Amino acid sequence: MGKPHPLKPGDTISLVSPASFLTPEQTEGGIKYLTSLGYRVKTYPSTYRADGYLAGTDAERADDLTAAFHDPETQAVLCARGGYGSSRLVPHLDFDSLAKTEKLFIGFSDITILHAYLNQRGLPTLYGPMAFTFGYEREQWVYESFADVISGRSTIPTAAPKGDAVHPGVAEGIVVGGCLCLICDLLGTPGQIDMTGKIVLI
């Protein structure tokens, strides 16, 4: 399995909602930021749909996610937000076919579930900001780091504030993990994350 290619101006980012919905104002804020970077943005019905707490039925959200991955004009698939609902898509998705597209997949929080299944199939993904993130004003480093990483200018968010290390040192390896409650939900399932020899992000 190959790695997703860095994005370049003019590339298309498909905006999908596998979990909870966004308000139109939040969605437009995310689209405005992405287009300011020079990217085209493609939306799907679930991008603007609301069905209770979710962005449509499980089948509708899964169909949109599948369509985005298999769209030949799309280079990256960006989740609108997390919240709840991604785990309900698992029975509706063919992760083998999604991973083979080698599209850049981006999201965090509830999207942990989808990362886990795609990573199992050899597709590296980006645990990072979503459209929801850019629907509000954020610190400048959030915008800079996101733009640098998706374009391949940096593999780490160099502009982010530095934390304090409990045990300083250097580690190299494959990073896995995500939202702790979702990591726990995956235990004992086919999507359980293999952490052997990995760097675990929580």
Named regions from a protein language model:
Residues 1-73:
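ATP/NTP phosphate-donor binding region
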Residues 76-87, 92, 108:
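N-terminal glycine-rich "phosphate-gripper" loop used for MgATP/nucleotide binding
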